[in-house]
Curated annotation (Swiss-Prot):
GO terms for molecular function: citrate (Si)-synthase activity. InterPro entries: Citrate_synth-like_lrg_a-sub, Citrate_synth-like_sm_a-sub, Citrate_synthase, Citrate_synthase_AS, Citrate_synthase_sf. Pfam families: Citrate_synt. This is Citrate synthase. It is an enzyme of class 2 (transferase). Keywords: Transferase, Tricarboxylic acid cycle. It comes from Thermosulfidibacter takaii (strain DSM 17441 / JCM 13301 / NBRC 103674 / ABI70S6). It catalyses: oxaloacetate + acetyl-CoA + H2O = citrate + CoA + H(+). Pathway: Carbohydrate metabolism; tricarboxylic acid cycle; isocitrate from oxaloacetate: step 1/2. The active site is at H274, H320, D375. Its EC number is 2.3.3.16. The gene is gltA. Catalyzes both citrate generation and citrate cleavage. Part of a reversible tricarboxylic acid (TCA) cycle that can fix carbon dioxide autotrophically and may represent an ancestral mode of the conventional reductive TCA (rTCA) cycle. The direction is controlled by the available carbon source(s).
């Protein structure tokens, strides 16, 4: 496989570079670590390495240095499906892994590899899912299905056989190819079992990774294929410090294989503070539609936004921990909606919110970022095309996030980074020594 051959050339170079950095600059500060960091979820603490993506306040996420508009529209546009516009996530995965823009041939090779391996999901995985009550939360089923596949791990087998550390990334790559191929199959199986009468659809060997997920869920429409390609591209990676990405790296640092680490990551993603935002936005938009009997006027929405804020509530889908501009992932989804569903009533409310709410938040004065984030839009797109099972939205998020999590895991195993082991402190210690500690920046 050309991807593996290219990584075999790049990873030894990167490993040497990382070793040199650790040797030369290992005692340099990235920033001051404060008591506030320890009690505040380590928010903003520069203590992890992630080379696949970086989030900038004024540009949003960059995948290996490229912005979303660059990769989606040019000048570095990723390959697309025949007759399509949206980037194929297979191409993004190549970029995340290598740091290089893929050719059409690179993308076709990865896509063909995924399609071939989709046929290899063991029957016992489906048996595990069938043994669970049908009303089990889809994210619980998703995490269980992933973990059930651990029996197939190449990394685990080779580690038991005494695999050299320099070879860890190769086994991680093989597991990642198998898991990424299996995820659409598992996700679609859960969807059909829970919501579509337990009838199931096999993968289509002629479809790409994202389109096959839509197909196996029962949505054979080119616009849905394009939406899934865009969705998987946009939600794929967002640095290494969010709950799902960090969980994946933490568990993986103990030499747990990708099935174990990514299953753990999905349990983090299932938490309401991480993976439920787009559902909350959609419910809020639908509540507005019901309250006003359709699309509200600008004045009605402005008054309702003020009432919401003055009652101490937040407006879902607006604001971001890092961004200080409209999330480029939101802009890409808005562009898709303007092209494919400009007359959708819920989209009209989303557009009106974009016009009204930032100005209200600016006047309110408490929001550091009054602009919409990625979650302000995605639920409405899924709803429009008939995917109306709120609880399943996080599974789609999880399938997408696997692209970034696998790429990060392969790279850190290539760098041969050690197990994570930060030092904890006690509240008693803080009370005893806090007054004597220097203030950050002093």
């Amino acid at each position: 496989m050309k991807l593996k051959e290219r990584l075999a050339e790049l990873i030894p170079q990167w490993r040497a570079e990382v070793a040199e950095i650790r040797k030369k600059y290992g005692n340099r500060k990235t920033m001051d670590c404060t008591i506030g960091h320890a009690y505040g979820g380590m928010r903003g603490l520069k203590a992890l390495v992630c080379d696949t993506s970086e989030v900038f306040p004024d540009e949003g996420v960059k995948f290996r240095g490229y912005t979303i508009p660059e990769l989606r529209e040019g000048p570095h546009k990723l390959p697309t499906a025949e007759g399509g516009f949206e980037p194929l996530p297979e191409g993004l995965w190549y970029l995340l892994l290598t740091g290089e823009l893929p050719t059409e041939e690179d993308v076709k090779e990865i896509s063909a590899e995924f399609t071939k391996r989709m046929q290899n999901v063991p029957q016992y995985v489906f048996d595990v899912l069938r043994a669970m009550p049908v009303d089990t939360h889809p994210m619980t089923m998703f995490a269980a299905g992933i973990l059930a596949m651990q029996r197939e791990s190449v990394f685990a087998k080779r580690y038991e056989e005494g695999m050299r550390r320099e070879e860890h990334w190769e086994a991680m790559l093989e597991d990642s190819l198998n898991m990424l191929a299996a995820l659409p199959v598992i996700a679609a199986y859960i969807y059909r079992r829970k919501y579509k009468g337990d009838t199931h659809i096999a993968p289509d060997p002629n479809l790409d990774w994202s389109a096959n997920l839509a197909h196996m869920m029962g949505f054979d429409d080119f616009e849905v294929y394009e939406l899934f390609r865009l969705y998987m591209f946009l939600h794929s990676d967002h640095e290494g410090g969010n709950v799902s990405a960090h969980t994946n790296l933490l568990v993986n640092s103990a030499y747990s294989d990708i099935y174990r680490s990514f299953s753990a990551a999905m349990n983090g993603l299932a938490g309401p503070l991480h993976g439920l935002a787009n559902q909350e936005v959609l419910r809020w938009i639908q509540m507005l539609y019901k309250k006003f009997g359709g699309v509200p006027t600008k004045e009605q929405l402005e008054r309702f936004a003020w009432d919401t804020l003055n009652s101490g509530q937040v407006i879902p889908g607006y604001g971001h921990a890092v961004l200080r501009v409209t999330d480029p992932r939101y802009v890409a989804q808005r562009d898709f909606a303007l092209k494919h569903l400009p007359d959708d009533e819920l989209f009209k409310i989303v557009s009106l919110c974009y016009e009204v709410i930032p100005e209200v938040l600016k006047k309110h004065g408490k929001a550091k970022n009054p602009w919409p984030n990625v979650d302000a839009h995605s639920g409405v797109l899924l709803w429009h095309y008939g995917i109306r099972e709120y609880d399943f939205y996080t599974v789609l998020f999880g399938v997408s996030r696997a692209l970034g999590c696998t790429a990060q895991a392969i790279l850190v195993r290539g760098y041969m980074l050690p197990i994570e082991r930060p030092k904890s402190i006690t509240t008693r210690w803080v009370k005893e020594v806090a007054e004597s500690l220097p203030v950050a920046g002093s």
